[in-house]
Amino acid sequence: PDNQAIIIVGDVDVNHIENKIKELFSGIKVPANAAKIEPVEVADNDTAIYVIDKDKEQQYDIFNIFMKHPAIPNAMKGDMSYLMKGYMDNVVTSMLGARYAEIAQEADCPFLQAGADDGDFLLSSTKGAFSLIGVAKPGKVKEAYAAVLCEAKRMHDFGFTATEYQRAMEEFLSQVEKTLANKDKMKNEQFTTQYVD
């Protein structure tokens, strides 16, 4: 019980809900021999680790590439540097996503779509990952993989143009304004997700 939490969002009677939680859960005690909960460190690796699998229900060839990095410590979450990192991650993945969308318009592009993200490494709390995802055209998995990775390498080596940044920043600000304008229409699960993260 000491490694669990209850998150309640919505228009509720705080005193009533707090008393109900205490009534239901205050009697639960931590067992004397409870296992110690410790985060499991995810090791770094010098060479690629890959898995290839098939799913007869999956119509497309999809690939994910994870580039691990240290996770953001919980103590830093909520401060200004964390918010700035979130902004930078959003803008970088948006700019790279725009490049992938533009490339996908070319007739000889080997992928149907591609994108990038930066967040948790699978279920790990000790590692984050910059990740790329691609959906290959039929029979073009190797070419699609190479094209997606090549554009990410180009981003790493040469960065972005001022025009790309301006467009991404304007999109970000537009999203923020839209969220603010609709703040009274946010669903409870949106708040819950933010609290869990």
Question: How should each PLM-predicted stretch be described?
Answer:
Residues 63, 85, 89-93:
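Long, His/Glu/Asp-enriched segments that create or flank divalent metal/ion-associated functional microenvironments
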Residues 25-27, 37-43, 70, 88-91, ...:
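Short linear motifs at secondary-structure transitions and domain/linker junctions
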Residues 2-9, 59-80, 100-197:
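M16 family metallopeptidases and their MPP-like homologs
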Residues 16-23, 91, 95, 143-150:
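Long, highly charged amphipathic alpha-helices
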Residues 5-63, 170, 174-180:
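An aromatic/glycine/proline-enriched structural segment found at the starts
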Residues 36-42, 82, 94-99, 162-167:
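Short C-terminal domain-edge/linker segments immediately following a structured domain
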